[in-house]
Amino acid sequence: MKTFAAINVGSYEQSLKIYTITKNSGIREVDWIRNRLDLGGTFATGKLSHEVMDELCAVLRNVVSIMEGYRVDDYRACATSAIRETKNTAIVLDQIMQRTGVKLDVLSNSEQRFLDYKSIASRGGFEKIIEKGTLVLDIGGGSIQMSLFDKDKLSATQNMRLGVLRLQEKMSRLNVRPSENGPLLEELLEAQLSVFRKMYLKDRVIENIIVVDDYISALILGKLGKVAGSGYLDRDSMASYMNYLQDHTDMEIVRYFDTPEENVPLLRISSAIVRQVALMTDAKMIWAPGVSLCDGMVYEYAEEYKLLAQVHDFEQDIVTCARGISKRYMGSKRRAETLEQIALTIFDSMKRVHGMGRRERLLLRIATLLHDCGKYISMVNLGECSYAIIMATEIIGLSHREREIVANIVRYNHLEFDYSMENSEGIDREEYLTIVKLTAILQIANALDCSH
């Protein structure tokens, strides 16, 4: 049995979850400690104030003492958009390490959302729901992520800066009367979501919405759900709930739903987002599994150490996402499949020579699928255009550094290799060697493709 601690430094709340993991019983949550500290000021200023920094370090020191009490075998601490968007992130992380001993990983948006998907998969019912058209709505403090699943495969994903704290900050700057907040918020959301609808929802039928957030999920699991604790809510119940929010004061909402008063403004914003997405998709059912980023961390840890049977093929989701990007930029499907087959055969046959692993194989696979996406912009400047497209497009499940590796592989498939890039582009030695090896494999695969 292993004892694992997951720490989430969120924009509005910091949480610690303690788990035990066994092969027979799987993952079991032992304790969940939450602390309210608003870090959302970074969205406006780009910095953490000294007072907030002191408070955050005090919280993390307390977390360390709790972990010592539980004698945890391992831990992972992650920070999301509030820390990610600071201007001096490296200094903040160094201060936290020096003052608390906690090594904090700052997740890119795609890494954060990928962990959230893993947390959903750790709950039963995920595989069955995504067999039909499903939209996963992941609501954070700084942004929301909308991902479409069709026939249990991830088909498209899009990030939008419509997080609850960011919207609250924007609304407070507009300085409107409380009675105007609702209509103005709907107007803001509708303007942004209409773009998503035009791009991704033309011919799709969405039957289910899976909601991941810190506010409305708790209510759906409690009072709002069809059956208490099930987390399922139908369209009519959602409409009744929204009408209640509009017609009642904050104190009435606090008493009726038994929720903290400071949560109500963010609850209203989160509910408005869910309502607008439900109207846009015309979904029949909303499911709130009540998971958090911490659940994704422990799932990934258990998966890595083979303490848990795999529930869903997440690697295939990354590949499907890359195929969708290739299709959007009118890449050649047949050519990409041929190149993928040749490149992966070379990779698998030369493992003793190149010494790379499964993750690098995935990066090569994505590079083959996106090898010609730059043609959408320019048939001449193909390498640079492909690089620009890949760096500007989010590939769910890949970190920023991994996306940069893929972009460079595709770039130097069309251009002469720049051997000085290790020193000039902030790429470390290990990443540089990965780019060199995978570019060489892709170039050989290119030369061996008779159809080209």
Labelled PLM ranges:
Residues 23-45, 68:
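Conserved ATP-binding subdomain of kinase catalytic cores across diverse folds
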